[in-house]
Amino acid sequence: MGPNLQPPIPPPFLARMERLLGDEFGAFAASLALPPATGLRANTLKLSPQRLRELWPFDLAPLEWLPEGFVVPADETPGAAVPADGPITQARSRAVDAAPSRSQPGKHPYHAAGLYYLQDPSAMVVARLLDPQPGERVLDLCAAPGGKATHIAALMGNRGLFVANETHGRRVWDLAENLERWGARHAVITNESPDRLAERFEGFFDRVLVDSPCSGEGMFRKSPAARLEWTPDLIEGCARRQASILEAAARMLRPGGRVVYATCTFAPEEDERTLARFLSAHADFELVEPTRLPGFGTGRPDWIAGGAGSEQVGRAVRLWPHTGPGEGHFAAVLHYLGEPAGSATTRRPPRDRNREKAARGAADLFHRFCHDHLARDIRPERLEVAGTYLYAVPPGLPDLTGLRFIHPGWWLGTVRRDRFEPAHALAMGLELADFARSVSLPAGDDRALAFLRGASFPSQGEDGWVGVGVDGFPLGLGKRVGGSVKSHYPKGLRWS
């Protein structure tokens, strides 16, 4: 295999899909030879889809079934290497090694400002099927890198309690970074197994998303690793894991709640069969028939053996690369009809007077910072200290003692003795008008690029913390001293 060639699509996979698809197989196989689609979803926490189209330097093709979703024409992303479900970012420990380009959406200041997320167009259907509402309790159980989590946060309008969980110890930091850039203020980021969460949150959530780890057949167009890793045994192993995750999700749902089960694979063992087996064991769940929008195929009960539950799987949604934009997805909406298996075990943290005293002291420093550097005071309902970090904790969050978490809410900043240092997350959760001092730079301005590289730039005005933005949207924080703004853009995110 040459250096520029992808490994071949596994022949056993093609033979299997030919058997399943029949006359459709030719169109499906031809679609696998096409370039992957690049999707772009507007961040409605920060701007309207129409405003994004006005700002964007090139055309965007709207998705028929998602107002905030777009497809970026292939000829407008020359040389762009866009991942399947996430922006072109790196973990905080690695700098972004790419020159900025207006023609590559992952290397643009608007991306750094969190105005959009790069996502497979077919993956955008999942959060819409979950349909989270402002004020609800929502869980994304397998949330990294954050494509569906950022969508959920936007649909909730930063109101309610949103728990974004990822079991993988490294990927959870990508999730945290993407939610931070997105401006999610009501998100709690945990790093736990589904079973451990189920022990703590039984019967707690209104909606749960299971975007399950899978064999990744829908990644073949863009991921050489997915082609190399695929085997029939991988499918069976994933199916066993998916069944366990779905069981844990069901335990955490309140009566009348909704679970959306989704994968990016075509394998019926992981899709229809997993659902059918779950339904046969849970008569108190039913599969909901969603509105059939353009390009929405159905589940295929004919691909699995009959039995209890199999008659419902036709209500699932299948999106295919040969029938619409995107790489392909499977999603199903489960409605919980019954009573919870047990009473919810959630609880408020035990009273800790030393912790309360530390929180009061940190809150005083934070409000002093707001008075000196912001145009308004921010008074969350609940402020808590974790180590030296100060958080605005979403109302209704129960005790997390004993659970692994990254952020128990909106990270406001760090308390250092008698001063408060604002976090990047604080800036990304605000509007530029919320800062007492701000600098808004055009997207093509060299000063904006200098800021993203961590360099200072000239700026006259009052000394102090400054909100630095691009075309009116925050990019991060700087500190002005003597006519120069020093960039406080996080070192691990800086452009090179």
Place the predicted regions along the sequence by residue.
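Class I S-adenosyl-L-methionine
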Residues: 80-81, 205, 240, 258-261, ...
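Conserved class I S-adenosyl-L-methionine
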Residues: 135-142
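Polybasic, low-complexity RNA-engagement segments
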Residues: 1-20, 26-53, 327-330, 337-496
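S-adenosyl-L-methionine
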Residues: 167-202
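Helix-to-beta-strand junctions that scaffold the AdoMet/dcAdoMet cofactor pocket
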Residues: 157, 253-255
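Mobile active-site "lid"/loop adjacent to the S-adenosyl-L-methionine
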Residues: 170, 206-247, 260, 264-271, ...
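Conserved SAM-binding loop of SAM-dependent methyltransferases across substrates and taxa
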Residues: 145-158
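A short acidic, Gly/Pro-enriched loop at the edge of an enzyme's catalytic core
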Residues: 133-134, 198-209
